[in-house]
């Protein structure tokens, strides 16, 4: 089976170009199995604001206490995931919404105590995911369940998407409101792994882009052939990436 992981950022979800679903339908008609992973940062922030809770980030990652976790879980599973599945189904693209708990899709562990209820994936149930791909487009939110302590955890959606791509040895398209990796305000078309650390050290890659590229580096070192970071608001962006039309930034082991 040939998979493509497509990570849709929270910013793109509110302004997702309708061609994304059509492009995904086209992939399936060509026996390519797309797997959607989504975040929901803006929606989580809005839900927290409604409860007078201020979001807090460390090194680009959301700090998640118990109250924040409860709101995050409800927002991602009941609101964002459900709405996205409905959107796909309305376009005659049969989709199924999933979190880590469903079909024991993936297992997690706590990331770091300072981040609270933030987890990282440790194993992926490839058999279950492969079977679901033959019937539906899986739409996976970034909520996981820890079988050891019986708690739900928030996972950085990029981290989860990269982990799935590495586990399946599949390419990943990371779609957000960012056109690619910017160096001196210019999108670079290709970023080899060897250049990532120096760009971070020099401050050219900073903020929320740091975990994105480090997770991409880790994914490629563990089996993912390439990572493409591109804008999800452009028409037919998935088709353009698939056809190697040089959109966004392609992160790869070395320059071709």
Swiss-Prot record:
Substrate binds at residues 40-41, 62, 154. Its EC number is 2.7.2.8. The record marks 7, 212 as: Transition state stabilizer. Keywords: Amino-acid biosynthesis, Arginine biosynthesis, ATP-binding, Cytoplasm, Kinase, Nucleotide-binding, Transferase. GO terms for cellular component: cytoplasm. It catalyses: N-acetyl-L-glutamate + ATP = N-acetyl-L-glutamyl 5-phosphate + ADP. One of its GO terms (biological process) is arginine biosynthetic process via ornithine. It is an enzyme of class 2 (transferase). Belongs to the acetylglutamate kinase family. ArgB subfamily. Catalyzes the ATP-dependent phosphorylation of N-acetyl-L-glutamate. PANTHER family: N-ACETYLGLUTAMATE SYNTHASE, N-ACETYLGLUTAMATE SYNTHASE, MITOCHONDRIAL. This is Acetylglutamate kinase.
